[in-house]
Amino acid sequence: MFRQEQPLAEGSFAPMGSLQPDAGNSSWNGTEAPGGGTRATPYSLQVTLTLVCLAGLLMLFTVFGNVLVIIAVFTSRALKAPQNLFLVSLASADILVATLVIPFSLANEVMGYWYFGKVWCEIYLALDVLFCTSSIVHLCAISLDRYWSITQAIEYNLKRTPRRIKAIIVTVWVISAVISFPPLISIEKKGAGGGQQPAEPSCKINDQKWYVISSSIGSFFAPCLIMILVYVRIYQIAKRRTRVPPSRRGPDACSAPPGGADRRPNGLGPERGAGTAGAEAEPLPTQLNGAPGEPAPTRPRDGDALDLEESSSSEHAERPQGPGKPERGPRAKGKTKASQVKPGDSLPRRGPGAAGPGASGSGQGEERAGGAKASRWRGRQNREKRFTFVLAVVIGVFVVCWFPFFFTYTLIAVGCPVPYQLFNFFFWFGYCNSSLNPVIYTIFNHDFRRAFKKILCRGDRKRIV
């Protein structure tokens, strides 16, 4: 990613980063005093300490948050869905950024020169691009996974196995490596002509136009465009499904499977255990992103854990189903469906306000079913607003963290001057995305919050499980 300004050997590799001599630029890289005296640092002691503290907090928060994500996925029963392996791989990339990249970037920044030699300069910058690119491509893969689970519904969810998810993750890393490593493959011949003696070596970003443009497109602009288009499409589908009430929705509106059962808004099939006909076969209220709004099955569904809103959890399985929803299983033994009551019969053992003749009972049942549909309809409208906000957070944080860096990076390559301080700020601001990913993809999810409580509050573990 970086150009070798000062030739070190005949036939050397064109590196990702350049270990170049930089004489007389004390504001950027520091200088060496005549006679081998003390090096001048680019910042005062107070500023240096502030930068070290801020970068240290960034590294700690990134490692801590992403380690929590990995532990939660592997220890929580509610997070065993195969697609959560995306979050494990994403968290691993962010941890590697915080441990193998940021410390050396910090040292280079506060010391004013590259201390660690040419070989590690190339490795460090290759890893920098690899991990940051893989983090971005992971977000893109997650958005595509959500889109396929909506548009292909049953077919994709049947194919969404751990093996398939792992194959996609490997593909993500291969794409990131292809974007990151081409300069290490090309060999650039340079003469061994004389030049000025090295003063302060520095590891700088590659300014070769072909690589800057290609890496910027592959690392940011293309994944960003894909994410935006995919999330816009997800929002359009969710909005269309909630705009039409369930009672007016045709068989093609939600791609209902045979039998008339509606699919859940996230594209999954009907709720497990719902086997009765008519109003009783209506799926339970669900949120736009696939998480249930009221009762939830004991076993987490594939589409829930990765979603960004509230999701199912085992402690909600015993929650009452509310009016208009007959209980299923053993607890429904004493209940008689209105559709089974013959004309002239009365419902057994009902209270004073219960239905009398079969026609009245059937009418009340239909009225209760209609009220339940209206309630679900209003709930979906409210959840649409929350889902829109979550999508705005996902896309907004991604763009805000990375767009300034890649935009100025491209401007420099085409010859537009950019102040070093501004570019350096954008360079560090991009690292913040690695620490924010756990917040975006976990804090909005109820199962992750409960898993974090289980991890951090061991005394309360039995109740949380």
Curated annotation (Swiss-Prot):
Tissue: Expressed in brain.
Domain of life: Eukaryota
Compositionally biased tracts (Basic and acidic residues): 313-330
Residues under site feature: Implicated in ligand binding: 128
Site (Implicated in catechol agonist binding): 215, 219
GO molecular function (one): protein kinase binding
Chief localisation class: membrane
Any one GO BP annotation for this protein: negative regulation of lipid catabolic process
Residues carrying covalently attached carbohydrate according to the record: 25, 29
Pfam families: 7tm_1
Residue numbers on the Cytoplasmic membrane side: 75-85, 145-164, 233-389, 446-465
Keywords: Cell membrane, Disulfide bond, G-protein coupled receptor, Glycoprotein, Lipoprotein, Membrane, Methylation, Palmitate, Phosphoprotein, Receptor, Transducer, Transmembrane, Transmembrane helix
Extracellular-facing ranges: 1-48, 112-121, 189-207, 415-424
Location of the region described as Disordered in the Swiss-Prot/TrEMBL record: 242-377
Feature: compositional bias, Gly residues: 353-364
Subcellular location: Cell membrane
Topology relative to the membrane: Multi-pass membrane protein
SUPFAM superfamilies reported in the protein's UniProt record: Family A G protein-coupled receptor-like
Lipid linkage positions (S-palmitoyl cysteine): 457
Keyword set includes Transmembrane: yes
Residues annotated as transmembrane: 49-74, 86-111, 122-144, 165-188, 208-232, 390-414, 425-445
PANTHER family per record: ADRENERGIC RECEPTOR-RELATED G-PROTEIN COUPLED RECEPTOR (PTHR24248), ALPHA-2A ADRENERGIC RECEPTOR (PTHR24248:SF24)
Similarity comment: Belongs to the G-protein coupled receptor 1 family. Adrenergic receptor subfamily. ADRA2A sub-subfamily.
Function, in words: Alpha-2 adrenergic receptors mediate the catecholamine-induced inhibition of adenylate cyclase through the action of G proteins.
Name of the featured protein: Alpha-2A adrenergic receptor
Recorded name of the encoding gene: Adra2a
